[in-house]
């Protein structure tokens, strides 16, 4: 889960004076779009041609919650660190900011590959933090590496401050996140780990921990998703990035600040139906890609 449970997090946020997302407070959700999306910001791009099929507030800088873990994973996999190296969950990995729950108890040992798997598929916060903390360069330098990678990818309006996304200071735009998603989609291991429907971890504590994918669309046979990441904190709303095939086209989909977990999935379904209908029209003789709809 991204940060759990949402009701508990909302209570904590309300106590701190936070009752709505940054996007909602800025009025971005009120911007009308032809698909009637819940998300405050959205972007759909044809991965091969680069054509923008749909956009809504794609330049808005917003908190991105656990979408941050996509960059965490990219830095880990490109660092050459051995995935079979054992790391141990420590008190430093416990979330003291939002008090999100985790079944990885302090003292649990797992290898780096397992931590990577859990961070991507089920958005495990302690696993993600442990990935950064266990980097030989130290967690501060690890976060700097995340920001250097963002700059190298052309993510001009993005900043990372931790490996988990728990801080609302991890911020980006739909435009920038499409660049990150495109880069991550070229990493086969990240694609495999992020789209695993279920996974069992034989923990060093003797427990068998069962994890489910945080994206409900993964188990839907009508979807063909090769990479994905979900995210949620109150300030970010419900977020999702995907590399997915729709109507024979490889697309990048970015949704930021949807109004709820169900709304996030419903937005993705609206996009899927719209793209499929537009491709059908194109195949019947009008040609080209779906028209660019700007929110």
Give residue spans per PLM region.
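Polycationic, low-complexity disordered segments in secreted or periplasmic proteins
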Residues: 1-2, 292
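Domain-terminus/edge residues, biased toward the C-terminal soluble/receptor-binding domains
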Residues: 155-159, 165-295
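Active-site-adjacent loops and short helices of periplasmic peptidoglycan-processing enzymes
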Residues: 2-175, 179-188, 246
